[in-house]
Amino acid sequence: MYIIIIGCGRVGSQLANSLSMEGHNVVVIDENSRAFKRLGANFNGTTLIGNGYDKELLQEAGIEKADAVAVVTNGDNTNVVSTQVARKVFNVPIVVTRIYDPKREQLYRELGLNVIGGTTVVAEMIKEKITHGHFIHQLSEVGEIKIIEFKIDKNLAGLTLKEIETKEQSKIFAVIRDKEIFFPEKEMIVKEKDILLIVSKNR
């Protein structure tokens, strides 16, 4: 696949390296040339300096042949504009956008964005969305820590995340709702069929 990544922070650099190692053609765009140091010496993709909504720069990046674009800068406004340019101007088939402010979720949804929030696990989620067309929902376990996928039934619907954390003695780090993933506030009220990603210690 030919993939453009806009933003070379922690998520962007991790995503770029992961996709590049799997054999995909990767172009990374960032306004700060120093950000490319995060990619390391083994990155064999292309880097371009500039913003992700500059049409000429995007054409130089090869957006007209891109299979997917991941927009992962550190600003929601920049991400929205860059996403709309990729989708509306260049008709990129897959565009995945990072979200920081969960309060904007409804706006992002109305714009038709594929939004993902958070930090560490986000790059892997974006990679799965780009390469396989869906978000990962797998259980995993590392040492004493395990990640649990927990589906909300009607008995738990209406509770806040804080109340559920107390019940389960675990840490909720993401909520999947209508195939969108974001990092919510603890006072968020869950709905039936929400899926929680929970970090828990092995007992």
Q: What are the residue ranges of the model-derived segments?
A:
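Cytosolic regulatory regions of ion transport systems
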Residues: M1-R203
